[in-house]
């Protein structure tokens, strides 16, 4: 297994009207023996980054290290990596056993050892009973397990997966991602997993690297990414329903939502620059952190429910608030929320996220800057 270190990595493609930058100055370390997801929207550069780690693309600039080994110029077959792609590519006329063992075909491994390794990996992937069957006799999920087994049997230094579950049904995807996480922990294989699906990334990852326009927006554990987003892009990309962002003004320790008299008092430790004049910010609140209560005469934030999505254990209410351009999203376990009814909307000061209104960067207690004079 290996730690993957990317230094000042850049990838530029030639296009008819000039150049297209796919990866722009990526510096990061992917930890040994962990599962790290490269997460981002389509076109953000995550697959290009994975292909450079694999050796399928050559960096325009920068270096790639596996532990202390510079592998930037090393051919893909000599890097000690295994890769599983989105499309399941099994040999249709070979048995499951032969498909799995194919990963060792060009290595000098005794036949008895190969058989034992195939048996072991098939048992771990719960496909031992299918070893003598052909791929067309298997379900999509079983075929993907065979593809995983063929890659893992080589004991790779780094295991790379490019959206391997996107073509599978939802229930199969959920089951397979659980099995993959358990297997990765058991084998302690350094794993890099590309996905655009935030739910998969949150469920699978030890760490997540969020990419946008070829650059890293944030890297951290799923909890860090969700609870402490580095900017509004991360805050809006992670979490479903999407975070609410309100324009607000910070006056000392008082946070007031623009266009209303509704506000909250923040602790001085949460807002170090508490003595400043008013600062324009974006106030972020997760839908699960908002509360609905009957309309009152107080100066509260309020909105009228226009739609309730019934999702089972919790519902999502969408409210029209006169002071906002967008509907406010509230996740609630209450069953008595009615459409076309007005409610007060409240939240705990400890649940707010503050962002600079101009840059979108998170405002932390240790780096809240003074407003421009």
Residues covered by each model-derived region:
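A short, flexible loop at the N-terminus of ABC-type nucleotide-binding domains that lies
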Residues: 1-6, 12-25, 29, 73-78
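ABC ATPase nucleotide-binding domain
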Residues: 5, 29, 65, 344-346
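Conserved ABC transporter NBD signature motif
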Residues: 62-70
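Non-catalytic connector elements of ABC transporters
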Residues: 252-373
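The feature captures the beta-strand-to-loop junction immediately N-terminal to the Walker
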Residues: 39-41
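Conserved coupling/switch loops of ABC nucleotide-binding domains, chiefly the family-specific signature
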Residues: 60-63, 213
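Helix-to-loop junction immediately C-terminal to a conserved catalytic motif
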Residues: 54
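ABC ATPase nucleotide-binding domains
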Residues: 74, 79-86, 90-236
């Amino acid at each position: 297994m290996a730690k993957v270190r990317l230094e000042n990595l850049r990838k530029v493609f030639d296009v008819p009207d000039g150049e297209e930058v796919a990866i722009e100055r990526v510096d990061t370390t992917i930890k040994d023996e962990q599962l790290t997801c490269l997460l981002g929207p389509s076109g953000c550069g995550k697959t290009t980054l994975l292909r450079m780690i694999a050796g399928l693309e050559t960096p325009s600039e920068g270096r790639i290290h596996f532990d202390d080994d510079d592998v930037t110029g090393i051919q893909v077959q000599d890097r000690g990596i295994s890769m599983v792609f989105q499309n399941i590519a099994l040999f249709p006329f070979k048995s499951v056993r032969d498909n799995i063992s194919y990963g060792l075909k060009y290595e000098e491994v005794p036949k008895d050892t190969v058989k034992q390794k195939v048996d072991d990996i098939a048992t771990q992937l719960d496909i031992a009973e299918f070893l003598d069957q052909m791929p067309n006799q298997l379900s999509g999920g079983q075929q993907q397990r065979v593809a995983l087994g063929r890659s893992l049997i080589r004991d790779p230094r780094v295991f790379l997966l490019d959206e391997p579950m996107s073509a599978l049904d939802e229930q199969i995807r959920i089951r397979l991602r659980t099995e993959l996480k358990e297997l990765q922990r058991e084998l302690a294989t350094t794993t890099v997993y590309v996905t655009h699906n935030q739910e998969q990334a949150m469920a699978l990852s030890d760490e997540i690297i969020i990419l946008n326009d070829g650059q890293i927006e944030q890297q951290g554990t799923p909890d860090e990414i969700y609870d402490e987003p580095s900017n509004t892009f991360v805050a809006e990309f992670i979490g479903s329903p999407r975070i609410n962002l309100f324009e607000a003004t910070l006056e000392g320790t008082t946070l007031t939502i623009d266009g209303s008299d509704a506000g909250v008092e923040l602790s001085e430790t949460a807002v170090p620059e508490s003595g400043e004049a008013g600062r324009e910010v974006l106030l972020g609140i997760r839908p699960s952190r908002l509360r609905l209560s009957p309309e009152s005469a107080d100066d509260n934030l309020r909105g009228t429910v226009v739609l309730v999505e019934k999702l089972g254990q919790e519902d999502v209410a969408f409210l029209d608030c006169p002071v906002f351009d967008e509907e406010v999203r509230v996740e609630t376990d209450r069953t008595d929320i009615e459409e076309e009814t007005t409610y007060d909307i409240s939240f705990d000061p400890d649940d707010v996220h503050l962002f600079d209104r101009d840059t979108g960067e998170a405002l932390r207690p240790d780096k809240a800057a003074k407003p421009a004079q």
